[in-house]
Curated annotation (Swiss-Prot):
Pathway: Purine metabolism; IMP biosynthesis via salvage pathway; IMP from hypoxanthine: step 1/1
Subunit structure: Homodimer.
Protein family: Belongs to the purine/pyrimidine phosphoribosyltransferase family. Archaeal HPRT subfamily.
Matching NCBIfam families: HPT_Archaea (NF040646), PRK02304.1-4 (NF002635)
A GO BP annotation: purine ribonucleoside salvage
Species assigned in the record: Methanothermobacter thermautotrophicus (strain ATCC 29096 / DSM 1053 / JCM 10044 / NBRC 100330 / Delta H) (Methanobacterium thermoautotrophicum)
Top EC group: transferase
Alphabetic keyword roster: Cytoplasm, Glycosyltransferase, Purine salvage, Transferase
Reactions catalysed according to its record: IMP + diphosphate = hypoxanthine + 5-phospho-alpha-D-ribose 1-diphosphate; GMP + diphosphate = guanine + 5-phospho-alpha-D-ribose 1-diphosphate
Record protein name field: Hypoxanthine/guanine phosphoribosyltransferase
Lineage, opening ranks: Archaea, Methanobacteriati, Methanobacteriota, Methanomada group, Methanobacteria
Reported function: Catalyzes a salvage reaction resulting in the formation of IMP that is energically less costly than de novo synthesis.
Short name of one Pfam family: Pribosyltran
CC annotations in GO: cytoplasm
Amino acid sequence: MLDKLKESLRNSPVIKKGEYDYFVNPVTDGIPLTEPELLEEVAEEIVRRFRPEADKIICIEAMGIHHATVLSLKTGIPFVVVRKRRYGLPGEVAVHQMTGYSEGELYINGVDSGDRVVVIDDVVSTGGTLLAVLEALREMDVDVRDVITVIDKGEGSRVVRERTGFTVKSLVKVDVIDGRVKVEDIPAGGPHD
């Protein structure tokens, strides 16, 4: 199960961004080539394990977009993108986020108080992006039903749970050891479910 995902992760090059070990993968970076079978495998497993039920899927630019697109097609749930640029639309909410390798503003549009949402992203590592978005959604009185990432790396899921109460559900856990990506299964019903 998830053979394509695991293989792509194990074959990922690792680069340094400051002190941060960053793996380059189609799921998290869109490079090298992102095969449709990989995206389909990921979306099918998300649907099988987590059965998203919501009015909207919220994804985070940029690498949450392709996961939200395929998940939307599989479930019929529309999606909205938390963007990295301001549009100035009525009701737009600005969010400041910090990760292990970047910092900046995110902008939430198309989400209203009372909306039932599933938040999807490619990876949780430091938790900085998810923390910022989840705190903003809470302040907006949005009903967050689930928080799902394809990959869990580092301590981010624990940080998100401790600071927000939300459990980040992921398909696999990875770590970078000696410049290589190590992949660990998170079984259905496991610690993130």
